[in-house]
Regions:
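N-terminal Lys/Arg-rich, disordered targeting/topogenic segments
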Residues: 1-14
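Secreted/periplasmic serine-hydrolase-like ester/acetyl group-modifying domain
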Residues: 2, 120-225, 314-316
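Hydrophobic membrane-insertion alpha-helices, especially the h-region
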Residues: 15-34
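Alpha-helical transmembrane signal-anchor/signal-peptide segments
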Residues: 36-57
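Short hydrophobic beta-strand that contains or immediately precedes a catalytic carboxylate
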Residues: 59-62, 282
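Membrane-embedded segments
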Residues: 65-150
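Histidine-centered active-site loop/cap adjacent to the catalytic His
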Residues: 284-316
Length: 316
């Protein structure tokens, strides 16, 4: 007599897991691999510095204010921008120590409203910290942490997967500047000062010592190697300046004055209220477009030639 085969409950469970769980996992893994293979600014910058770090004599650090707002080419063929969107002082400090800059002569670092108070991992853009682990071989976070994968921020993961059918608009120069912010591409109303000032606003300043710790380490690194440190505050539209949190601005200014007293060879160039920049130079209320970036970088180069150790308020 032929026996009929009845699958056990265990084998049935295994099949169900295989049919319903494995396909989504495989799709997730495929998406992860696809995203990691795509070009991005972090991957480009790491590749460039792995090969050419010894050639860099001027290094631009910072957030989107310098990623878009400074044109390295104006500063010379050996200038390079390591700035990235939402990059904090913690990562500026880390990256400065991460690559062996044997011939570095100058570091340019922005001081913005949020600089002393922002901790990337504690904010809504925490997922951006993964770029340092995934694409720049930084070991601040474990490979197996939430910062070791793209999919752990699922909304961002899904947005990046859209590159399958919509090409990315990100672009950058050979020396690391972000190129998307042009006058033609800016959206109206561009002068969103109230919105942007609120985005960068901190009501309490208890994190300032943490930010200053990293700034002091950058200052010490530069001083020990006779590297010129240039702090800059980039131009702001009038609507942005009117919406700034005065106590936050005063706290930042006080800390920067103290820093310069400790590191007197630091140059500070303050362009926040500079009248040299018109509406045509801005992309939004606190970012310059490419034309504005060219103007700002040319002005910085001129200031450094004429008064290399000036704490400038005449740029206002």
């Amino acid at each position: 007599m032929q026996r009929s085969f009845t699958p056990s409950k265990r084998s049935l469970h295994v099949r169900l897991i295989t049919w319903f769980i494995l396909p989504p996992i495989m799709l997730l893994a495929a998406g992860e691999i696809y995203i990691r293979l795509q070009p991005n600014p972090s991957k480009f910058k790491h590749h460039f510095l792995t090969l050419h770090n010894s050639e860099v004599d001027t290094l631009i650090l910072g957030s989107s204010h310098t990623y878009y707002g400074i044109e390295p080419e104006v500063l010379g063929k050996h200038a390079f921008s390591l700035a990235q969107v939402s990059q904090t002082l913690k990562y500026d400090n880390y990256l400065l120590h991460h690559y062996p800059f044997e011939n570095l002569r100058m570091v340019i670092l922005p001081i913005s409203d949020f600089s002393l108070y922002e901790d990337l991992e504690d904010g809504p853009e925490w997922h951006m910290a993964s770029r340092y682990r995934l694409y720049m071989q930084c070991d601040i976070h474990s490979r197996w942490s939430a910062y070791g994968w793209e999919f752990t921020s699922f909304p961002t993961y899904c947005t990046k997967l859209k590159q399958l059918w919509t090409p990315s608009q990100m672009s950058w120069s050979r020396q690391g500047q972000g190129l998307e912010y042009t006058l033609d591409s800016r959206q109206e109303p561009w002068d969103n000062g109230t919105e942007r000032a609120l985005h960068n606003r901190y009501e309490t300043f208890e994190k300032a010592p943490y930010g200053m710790k990293h700034l002091h380490e950058i200052g010490t690194y530069c001083a020990r190697r006779s590297i010129k440190l240039v702090l800059i505050s980039t131009p702001l539209s009038e609507s942005y300046r009117k919406a700034q949190h005065c106590a936050q601005v005063e706290d930042t200014d006080r800390h920067i004055r103290d820093f310069i007293r400790m590191f007197p060879n630091t140059t500070y160039l303050d362009f926040r209220s500079s009248k040299s920049f018109s509406n045509h130079d801005f992309y939004d209320a606190d970012h310059l477009n490419r034309a504005g970036a060219h103007k700002l970088t040319s002005t910085i180069a001129s200031c450094l030639r004429n008064a290399p150790n000036t704490v400038s308020s005449t740029t206002r």
